[in-house]
């Protein structure tokens, strides 16, 4: 055996040992682009960049989303990659200071998420806020899921949301911008409505209707006109005490947020849904948004309050408690155009000629509280003349703020002509409302636009 062979073998064994004990080299994990992103970072990005990020991260269903919806989708993807759940809903703050995120039609449900008092105080959260964030499942002694971290409030960064103003502190002014409701030359409901009772942003309107006069159809046409011509408006249809099949039909007919509590549900549930819908609208207006609520009907909402509120010890005609009038008046009175920006428009249907003294009393209490009224006529409905608008009784206060000077002059001329057609003649050959309305609709059908109709009316004189 050579002299150096022993030393060489020992060295070889030590090198082998080092090779065996050396940690294997691993490739570093690629950094997740979504990991460090917050709501404010995503808001600062352009829509094109957000879509590129969603495509690169293999997020499905992003191509047709608006910016705010795409941001929420990316936040959801970020949360789920951490192994957590992502949830949210409309906040309902209780008197104890805690809150719950309502996920089912603005009403209490088994999937509600608990929000702690500290989170509500930190971000100045209010009833009606749309809150989304990281959610954990309930522990053994808990009933609801709990909100761990708030990612967004009403679609914006929660740190910015806590600096918004309060609805009561905003300055109400008259409506100054009219809604364009016409979607087709053949939609005579919208065309006639824009002439006799224009609707502006911030309008407080009452649609007075006997049964079967087409009030639901009028609401649908208004909703379709707003959603098609004013996509920036947040449209809410609130159905209280309606039939379930009508709720389904409305949901399929309009591109709007449909909130409902049908007649077979309790009065307390109907009141809860209506109040949550109003609170949701107020929170959006505080952010400068334009919101429209179509309420069907304020009569049934008042009836529900009449069963829920504590008795005042007094009773009006028809069994109506005076205390039951204050909450629906507060709902209707919330409509306003905001000087600082934003508006809340409320168009509510009111039932008359139902044979109920209570319904007549409710109408008498709300008559004159709005700044726009649209009356539907029973005689026109009986003759199946639609839209069954009572032109003489319908109108908008301060319509000169919504119509141009020339259009206003022509509309006044139209009203004078309609009144003369209905005035009784000495010979007994005067027109009644049926003949006058038929003549008006006949002339309206001969033109494709309201401007053409008014110009033709002026030239014929």
Predicted regions and their residues:
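Short beta-strands and strand-coil junctions in structured, solvent-facing domains, enriched
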Residues: 59-61, 107-109, 121-122, 138-141, ...
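P-loop NTPase catalytic core
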Residues: 214, 222-461
């Amino acid at each position: 055996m050579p002299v150096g062979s022993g030393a060489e073998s020992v060295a070889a064994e030590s090198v082998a040992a080092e090779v065996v004990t050396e940690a294997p080299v691993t490739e570093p994990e690629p950094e997740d682009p979504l990991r460090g992103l917050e709501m404010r970072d995503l808001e600062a990005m352009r829509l094109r960049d957000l879509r590129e990020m969603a495509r690169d991260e293999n997020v499905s269903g992003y191509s047709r989303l608006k910016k705010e919806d795409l941001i929420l989708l990316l936040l959801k993807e970020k949360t789920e990659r951490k192994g957590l759940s992502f949830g949210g809903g409309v906040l309902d703050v209780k008197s104890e200071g805690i809150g719950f995120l309502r996920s089912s039609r603005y009403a209490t449900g088994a999937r509600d998420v608990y929000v702690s008092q500290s989170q509500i105080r930190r971000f100045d959260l209010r009833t009606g806020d749309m809150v989304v964030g990281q959610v954990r499942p309930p522990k053994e002694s808990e009933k609801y899921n709990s909100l761990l971290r708030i990612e967004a409030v009403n679609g914006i960064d929660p740190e910015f949301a806590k600096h918004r103003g309060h609805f009561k502190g905003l300055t109400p002014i008259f409506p100054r911008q009219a809604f364009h409701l016409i979607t087709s030359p053949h939609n005579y409901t919208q065309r006639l409505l824009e002439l006799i009772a224009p609707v502006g942003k911030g309008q407080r309107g009452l649609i007075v209707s006997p049964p079967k006069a087409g009030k639901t159809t009028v609401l649908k046409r208004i909703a379709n006109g707003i959603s098609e011509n004013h996509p920036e408006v947040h449209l809410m249809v609130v159905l209280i005490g309606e039939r379930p099949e009508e709720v389904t039909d409305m949901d399929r007919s309009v591109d709007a947020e449909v909130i409902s509590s049908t007649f077979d549900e309790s009065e307390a549930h109907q009141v809860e849904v209506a109040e949550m819908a109003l609170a949701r609208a107020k929170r959006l207006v505080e952010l400068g948004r334009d919101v429209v609520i179509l309420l069907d009907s304020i009569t049934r909402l008042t009836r529900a309050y009449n069963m829920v509120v504590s008795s005042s010890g007094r009773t009006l005609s028809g069994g109506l408690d005076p205390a039951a009038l204050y909450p629906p008046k507060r709902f209707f009175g919330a409509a306003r155009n905001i000087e600082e920006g934003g508006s809340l428009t409320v168009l509510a249907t009111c039932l008359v000629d139902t044979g109920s003294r209570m319904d007549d009393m409710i109408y008498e209490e709300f008559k004159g509280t709005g700044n726009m009224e649209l009356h539907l006529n029973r005689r026109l409905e009986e003759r199946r003349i639609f839209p069954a608008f009572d032109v003489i009784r319908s109108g908008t206060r301060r319509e000169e703020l919504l119509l141009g000077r020339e259009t206003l002059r022509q509309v006044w001329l139209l009203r004078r002509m309609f009144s003369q057609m209905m005035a009784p003649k000495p010979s007994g050959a005067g027109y009644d409302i049926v003949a006058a309305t038929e003549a008006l609709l006949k002339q309206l059908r001969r033109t494709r636009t309201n401007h053409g109709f008014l110009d033709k009316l002026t030239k014929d004189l």
